């Protein structure tokens, strides 16, 4: 492991750095230990250089720290016998630095990056399931966790730090992974967390309102997503042509694969493409007939709703662009399983059908309700809330969407965090034409229970917002709570 030596590690940036052996690469001084390399970056909330004395006291072997300007780039000092190397623009270089430290793990597998507001988790899971069915050892990285397929370990962020990402990829390679599908968040792109990764392919799902508390406006949010295609090493590019932003990007990416279920192909398009020619929705999912640059076929999907047809087609186009055979993909497609907490259906005889979904944006809630309606013979119920300390502007929008598309609406708490639940609910209700038609039940388990107990056998109850999550954030507490387990207990089935 030649690059676990400070001199070798820094060779591209610093001549004759001190030669010392390194154990692990650490960003958090609190977990630094003897032999580690502590990297002191200037973050959004804290200046890591303030914690250099603590890291030294804990026995680190060396430190790489943000330099004060380009003039100090490459400067080497010593503090209490520990070498400190200063690099300018350290945040931008961190992905490359971590890549060298962990022996460039992304070069040793097929790495697929999936970005977009909604559909990232399902698309990455479909890519991993599908490729594994065709012989790969597949892994996922994202919202529901990182790890080999079926063995993902839960994570806090969709895209971890630049060091976390390279470390996880290194672990996956050690475990035998040959294929990894990674969710790439807008935060991760803006903060350079995947800057040095070579993506075999990159997928764009869609763009709608989310994270405006961070990005400020939709233009900045779109620009963040565009970074994956404009400034990263990407082989194949797969773009959803049914999205307004995607259609615009396709005009700038002539070699990208256009994917559509609405026949949104540019007339005279010379690039590669895949389109649905017929979609039949039924109780168990959908039958999807398609045509493409690689040929025609038909897939039986077990996933609910139109947006999952889009996710399926994006995954299919990605694998076709990488050379996987069409006939084998079609056969394996019927075996793909729905994703935990993503339009996950719970059935019990004599009870309403309940669907648990992660939808927590206006667009996602709209699509989830439209999907549930396709499979509903009776009334459509919607139980949802909005998270605290996040974009307040989407709350009335989501209230209006629920009122318009559902027959019965129950507004409840999501993750209120430090906000008053009553204030969040008031924001939601402000978007309704007739707030009197809506039930407000703050306790989430009570709200879910009430909706299911009131609903009839033919009805569908959509429980939206938390999906796979097994906790609720109230104040500074992290409480044990799961929509999936609550629903399963009420219906007498296994979650």
Curated annotation (Swiss-Prot):
What is the recorded post-translational modification?
Carboxylation is probably crucial for Mg(2+) binding and, consequently, for the gamma-phosphate positioning of ATP.
Q: Single Gene Ontology BP term? A: cell division
Catalytic activity reported: UDP-N-acetyl-alpha-D-muramoyl-L-alanyl-D-glutamate + meso-2,6-diaminopimelate + ATP = UDP-N-acetyl-alpha-D-muramoyl-L-alanyl-gamma-D-glutamyl-meso-2,6-diaminopimelate + ADP + phosphate + H(+)
Q: Which cofactor does it need?
A: Mg(2+)
* A GO molecular-function annotation: magnesium ion binding
* Binding-site residues, meso-2,6-diaminopimelate: 390, 414-417, 465, 469
Q: What is its EC number?
A: 6.3.2.13
Task: Report motif location: Meso-diaminopimelate recognition motif.
Answer: 414-417
Query: What is the protein name for this chain?
Result: UDP-N-acetylmuramoyl-L-alanyl-D-glutamate--2,6-diaminopimelate ligase
Question: Origin organism of this chain?
Answer: Pectobacterium atrosepticum (strain SCRI 1043 / ATCC BAA-672)
